[in-house]
Amino acid sequence: MESYDLAIIGTGSGNSLLDDRYARKRVAICEQGTFGGTCLNVGCIPTKMFVYAAEVAETIRSAARYGIDAHIDRVRWDDIVSRVFGRIDPIAIGGEDYRRAQPNVDVYDTHTRFAAVQDDGRYLLRTDDGEEFTAEQVVIAAGARAEVPPAILDCGVRYYTSDDIMRIPQLPKHLVIVGGGFVACEFAHIFSALGVRITMVIRGGALLRHLDDTLSRRFTRIAASKWEVRSHRNILGSHENRSGIVLELDDGSDLQADAVLVATGRRSNADRLDADTAGIAMDDRRIVVDEYQRTSARNVFALGDVSSPYELKHVANHEARVVQRNLLCGWDDTKAMVATDHRYVPAAVFTDPQIAYVGLTENEAVAKGFDVSCKIQHYADVAYGWATEDTVGIVKLISDSKTGQLLGAHIMGHQASSIIQPLIQAMTFGLTVHEMARGQYWIHPALPEVIENALLGLSD
């Protein structure tokens, strides 16, 4: 039986752990899927490459408002897919080849789970092929998977998730998307911009309900002007007919589609690891970790979607850096360890309009007892907004009027994910609203002036 110093389950952010400090350690890497994990292969990176193609198409369609006549001759879906995965697939293949070539690393390419804890404290792991090995330390970075409602899963109809929709053989004429979160809205934007009719089926009354209410309501209105949104609806069943797929809704109606994308959330893969056999605690279907990313089992760490509620690649990368350092410390030596910092975790939704946010929503700030001040500034209020003829972009800032501290920032509009960065810095380093507004130059007439004006509105 092989014996290792370290076993890593998952090759998303977990694959970034090994640097020169681990060159003398024997390492087992366990990956049943494609090397690189969700973000590289079926998540953040390929979706944003599709989003960019969608934005090019939208720019052409809207060119007339700027005095330029243009039209789209054809959408070459095969070429779009080839452009994306012609870049992505070699990276995944190269990553696996690189690890396999390292003399201190063995790669196990079938599903791996915990088997038992040995008398000496080492962990026994077993693959679905029946191979067994032990490791002194284990890092669980097994990610998450798309969750499919039983009403669709049990009917046997063909459906897509974010794992495979980007490789659909051809563009459907009508795509029904089940779900109203960030994955659903990004794919609605992509396929709509490429000429596909979109219908969204959502259980609640609004899209992107995790956002601040102002942005969620505003985005839902914008989306409803472009896509059909069936709100307050559940799927009871589905079947196929000669025309495609039929979804049966709880109001008695049927919804005909050429293709169905299920985007109703993701579930941690923690339940597939037999973690309890190793004494690893779970809560709300995720592995429980402390601020050092330690699990309840000695010498076992976890990171990323398998243990984090954020489901964001930049969070997983941050946690990987923490684990990378803490693996080299004694298990109880917290003075030598570093802790994760999840105080101000930003996120973005790459739909149209783009959305970015960090910190508290207005409702959350009120619930926490802050003396809340809010300012909403429109893109149309600044010169760059005039240049782009923007009518939808807004910045909403939330502060504590007693201390001047920024509590939350919520942006909807062009390049929201880029222009929010100085606000993330302000919150992280404790700058007040007034210091942020007046302590630096703001380039005129650049788009970040909309942030400057919002800050000034709070500091007056």
Regions found by a protein language model. Name each.
Residues C155-P172, D254-T334:
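FAD-site-proximal beta/loop scaffold in flavoenzymes
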Residues E2-Y4, T127-Q137, D250-A259, S296-A297:
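Core beta-strand elements of the Rossmann-like FAD/NAD(P) dinucleotide-binding domain
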Residues D89-A92, M166, P172-V176, F182-V246, ...:
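Rossmann-like dinucleotide-binding cores of NAD(P)H-dependent redox enzymes
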Residues Y4-G33, T38, I45, M49-V56, ...:
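Flexible, glycine-rich terminal cap/loop adjacent to redox cofactors
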Residues I8-N15, T34-F35, A146, M166, ...:
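Residue-level detector of alpha-helix initiation sites
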Residues E2, N41-V42, P46-E132, L211-G237, ...:
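N-terminal Rossmann-like dinucleotide/flavin-binding domain of flavoprotein oxidoreductases
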Residues C44, A142-R197, V229, D276-S296:
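Glycine-rich dinucleotide-binding loop and its adjacent helix/turn
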